[in-house]
């Protein structure tokens, strides 16, 4: 019994791995590549922007470079996504989900904090240095927000990996519509013999009336 249970568990694991390989290498290969490239590119862009903002604000104190966190997380997430596309494994799916969730939460917090710092900062001056710093801050916030949106799309893509997920309601509605159409066709088939029998009865009644009229009283 234990050997049979172990064989069944191994077969289920092999089947899940085959489905994952088909999903990652064929069905969603392009989506995974776009996600990985987007995450890596956004992370590579955010890191120098965060360092520049930190240096211009507080003499290169890295404690003020909040976007460095989402940048590093984006690098790890993009690497895991590429690895999942190259060699699909079940643990890589879990790692990709964990990293994207962490990147989403951290990126959202950083965007909110940075926007509040920009909005509540000192009054803008006419100096070109302050204008350049503002452009760098807004750029870092925009790229960090882009990383958050990419993580949201990645989590949505992972949630659709199982058949029927996020589409059960539409499929159920389609099945109901098909059922209604079949029910609409059945009464038509049933009414056909009824109409025919009704017409036959009318013709028989007319013949009887004609015979009654022709017979002498």
Curated annotation (Swiss-Prot):
Locate the region Disordered: 187-217
Q: Name one GO cellular component term.
A: membrane
Q: Does the keyword Endoplasmic reticulum apply?
A: no
Q: Where in the cell is it found?
A: Membrane
Which UniProt keywords are given for this protein, alphabetically ordered?
Membrane, Transmembrane, Transmembrane helix
Can you tell me where the transmembrane regions are?
A: 33-53, 62-82, 96-116, 138-158
Membrane topology classification: Multi-pass membrane protein
The superkingdom listed in its UniProt entry is Eukaryota
| Name of this protein | Transmembrane protein 253
Native organism: Homo sapiens (Human)
């Amino acid at each position: 019994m234990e050997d049979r249970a172990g064989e069944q568990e191994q077969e289920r694991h092999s089947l899940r791995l085959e489905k994952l390989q088909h999903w990652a290498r064929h069905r969603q290969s392009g989506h995974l590549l776009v996600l990985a490239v987007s995450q890596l590119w956004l992370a590579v862009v955010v890191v120098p922007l965060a360092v520049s903002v930190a240096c211009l604000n507080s003499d290169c104190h890295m404690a003020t470079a909040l976007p460095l966190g989402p940048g590093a997380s984006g690098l790890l997430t993009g690497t895991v996504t590429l690895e999942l596309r190259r060699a699909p494994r079940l643990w890589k799916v879990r790692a990709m989900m964990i990293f994207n969730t962490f990147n989403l939460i951290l990126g959202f917090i950083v965007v909110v904090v940075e926007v509040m710092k920009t909005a509540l900062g000192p009054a803008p001056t006419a100096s070109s240095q302050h204008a350049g710093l503002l452009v760098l801050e807004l750029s870092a916030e925009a790229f960090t927000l882009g990383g958050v949106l990419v993580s949201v799309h990645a989590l949505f893509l992972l949630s659709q990996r199982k058949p029927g997920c996020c589409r059960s309601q539409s499929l159920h509605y389609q099945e109901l519509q098909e059922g209604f159409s079949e029910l609409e066709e059945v009464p038509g088939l049933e009414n056909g013999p009824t109409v025919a029998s009704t017409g036959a009865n009318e013709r028989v009644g007319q013949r009887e009336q004609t015979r009654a009229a022709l017979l002498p009283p």
